[in-house]
Amino acid sequence: LWWLYRDDLLPKPTKFCGYARSMLTTETLKEQCLPYMKVQPHEQNKYEEFWALNDYVSGRYDGRTSFEVLNQRLEMMENKNKANRIFYLALPPSVFEEVTVNIKQVCMSLCGWNRVIIEKPFGRDDASSQALSDHLAGLFNEDQLYRIDHYLG
């Protein structure tokens, strides 16, 4: 994301909000990411601008309450502006269903489009892959879904 931002390949004003179970802060994430970002000295100001657009929410994958907190943070970041939301799920397959239900029920943008990207093995076999596809079809339109499978990619 940093490289896309650095090269002005993202629409303005794109903002980023991470969500995971880990108890982290945005500052901690910034420190942990720095060795991998390949920031050149002349890019330091832009790098700081990039991190000013980032936020992080720690929460559970099960239950609605954490997703309500996430949605409140997203709304705060959007500041009542029209906003599109992309949910990039790099999660254990065992939590896909509960997380996608919570996203659908709590975190969808009401005044922009929504997309869900699912990255991971998409099921263990044909039957589990079909079950996940059926679950997602009950929540989202096909044009809202993107699937990235480590094994097929």
Curated annotation (Swiss-Prot):
Q: What Pfam families does the record tag this protein with?
A: G6PD_N (PF00479)
Q: Which residues bind D-glucose 6-phosphate?
A: K120
Task: Report the EC number(s), separated by commas if there are several.
Answer: 1.1.1.49
What GO terms fall under cellular component here?
cytosol
List the subcellular locations: Cytoplasm, Cytosol
The reaction(s) catalysed by this protein are: D-glucose 6-phosphate + NADP(+) = 6-phospho-D-glucono-1,5-lactone + NADPH + H(+)
Role summary: Cytosolic glucose-6-phosphate dehydrogenase that catalyzes the first and rate-limiting step of the oxidative branch within the pentose phosphate pathway/shunt, an alternative route to glycolysis for the dissimilation of carbohydrates and a major source of reducing power and metabolic intermediates for fatty acid and nucleic acid biosynthetic processes.
Q: What is this protein called?
A: Glucose-6-phosphate 1-dehydrogenase
